[in-house]
Amino acid sequence: MPLTLKEKLKEAQKKGQLKKLIELIIAETGVREDSIEVCSISYQSIIDHVYDLLVLENEVYDTNTQKSNFEKFIDSISGFEYLITYFMTENNIFFLKLPSQTIKESQELFWDSKKIMGNSRNRIFIKEDFSRGFVVLSSEYGIEKAEW
């Protein structure tokens, strides 16, 4: 079934946002474009995987309370490994696989930056095989976190 004009415009907008995001990451970190891979993983598949690991920090809404835990986690990952990382633009969610060394060297960009995270307070950093991960999700009751 052919795409409608509205669907084509939406897809073009999504591709444009993805291109802009990748260009921004390259400009801010110096990582090579061929070191960045777009992942087809879904947000729901990540939630399904970490659901039983999530711990609610009741009445805590500031994700920055987890920043030091993120720093410890990222420092424990070999610089030669890749992590799937969550990004949110104006109206799209993307998962990009990046060298962990790039994230280590630009922790502020990947944790705090409104440039690449939009208004999202969620943070997701996982290995492709789900053997290790660090997830902070914002909910109506507080933040939910998981590290494994």
Task: Name each model feature, range by range.
Residues M1-Y141, E147-W148:
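Structured alpha/beta or helical-core interaction and ligand-binding surfaces enriched in interleaved
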